[in-house]
């Protein structure tokens, strides 16, 4: 007996040792674990379609060891998603380094990590139906790791709804009522887009909550291209007339009660079905309730009546015997075009709904084979074929608009033209007086180059491009045919067109004096009482021998007396501030070039260079200096003339109205007003918008509800002398969004360069209000134009430019009328009735004339054009000269466009 017992005992001991050792090791491992990961909350966590969900995950350290953890660095956090037996990585983070999977880009975040090493909660936004599943939170720190998992359920379903009588039968108001009638609500664009990302497809146009009409397409096909051609996505017809008829996309979410199938042996008519449910303390279910139950897992292969007279059944596990190979709520129609509900006397089962205080669990899905459709289904067809897309009016079906925007003629006056300014304010001014002793260059003196200051004139405007050919002429004499009275803008004083005889060159002319306030805006073209700019008097009279006669006379040198300052105490309109785009070193003003004498500098006989289309060069005669004058705040300069006593010693809150800028100065607070406003606090309107336009902070706005593509809308705005609205401040954003509550175009676009967004009116991009995730240009679909979504705080989204939306036009409160007409020059470009402030136009001389002086004029802030300075003189025919030899080492001189020798010998060498 003993020999048998000992081997058995030894076997038992050997079998027990590994088990005990494993238990001991496991216990030690549990005791040595540094932390544990836990996901708080009741499972499953529920989120709503298109919304956001926070999955809480916290790290609990069992035995804190700060020094050890600090040496190990930040923990590694990994979130994974498990669904259908497959695992996918969501994100991995360690410290500030985060890697996000492409499917979750811009949708997930760790809001507390790494600031908090114990809170690694995940925020998942823009929830989609396929976001339902298991989420696992895993943390690794050194050699320790721990994880936890939780189930997430995304509830909410978007579905297309239509009346049984016909396709596309709902107006916008009727669509909202229809969704409410079936226990749902009209879906939002975000919900439809989230459903699309979850795989939803429907080739039927339907209303959404923002009054747009859209439909989602996963597989593009000829009948369902919409506005996206061959790309998948949500097709969008834009905001349409509320009386137009379409289907509607509804959204169902909660099922606060129990939905069950009533299946009596003899089936039921519609009225019998209502009675059947009432006898059981329930009522016949609505379509929205059935969709919510299907979204919760209800699977019944048995068609039943619903409250709207439709017959449907929910399928979670698809089969060929139960509606084909796709899950969803199946609907029975009488006709292949998916219209016609079954006759109310037909017999089917019924879906009933019983209210409860708390949402009840959906009954477990039964085996589809146990709930076969009734024999009555033989006369009913379940349509699964592809239907033809709704044919919209021609303007809504077009290819995307691309390319540049071209100017169009003005056909309507938008209230342009300049208004008469207010009476001039009493303020000191500084006058400049120029004295010119002679206008004839000294031919006998040594040549001195005049100082030329070059400045780029950057200007905007719709000007025609014209290629100009510069002709180098060889003249036998200097041409002094200056445009008489041109500077005074007198249309009755024509310029001389006949060549000046050789015998009529002047030796000297009387002094010429001009007195203008620096920065004073020139009056409009037709005001005779306006101060005149410097004027050049008299044609030359003294005869000088021609080069053929062998000598050239040297008239007395001319002297240009410097500017003299004269202080006066008198009233008069003034403009202050440095000219825009010009440095102080030039010593000249954009608005005061008329202060310069209309003569050439001593020793400089060259014509002014004709500026090109891109830039122009301004020539300031040598020896002329114009000192920068003090800036005098006046109403005409759109600044308050009297200091406002500060209430708190600063500009908070700002006392200025109408978008004025508050400036703190030693004497108090001063308001810098926008164009069109004046007064101490910018509370006085100096200009007003045309009837039908709304004024806000120096601009006028007009909203148009007619739907157009972006390019058509921009062209319509240009017909008024305006552009699609540009937005530069949050206040302007709120004004447009709150006043014109529509899904509308704005002027922002990247039609020229992808990703480089610019305003159509050329103002810089100083403010942005993009929707999260925008701009995205989804699937390279040509989303080059920007819309403002009013129901979402006016945030912006980029969409294809051929959408048809309403739009708002914007123009400046102050504008200029047609430019001054000159007798010998005309303006480039097509004429318009109004021009925005800072618009620059260019004159060109008529054929046969040569241009001198700057040809540009600018629309100023007071609604008046700057004074034209261009001079047009007759062009002399070229005359060949016989070459002569130089003597005594005297150099050749350039006089006009020909060369001549000083004091030539009496016997010049013969020509060739």
Curated annotation (Swiss-Prot):
InterPro entries: C-type_lectin-like, C-type_lectin-like/link_sf, C-type_lectin_CS, CTDL_fold, EGF-like_dom, Hyaluronan_bind_Proteoglycan, Ig-like_dom, Ig-like_dom_sf. It comes from the Eukaryota. Residues 647-683 form the EGF-like domain. Residues 464-478 have a biased composition (Acidic residues). This is Brevican core protein. The modification Phosphoserine is found at residue 418. SUPFAM superfamilies: C-type lectin-like (SSF56436), Complement control module/SCR domain (SSF57535), Immunoglobulin (SSF48726). Its main location: secreted. It comes from Bos taurus (Bovine). Residues 36-155 form the Ig-like V-type domain. Belongs to the aggrecan/versican proteoglycan family.
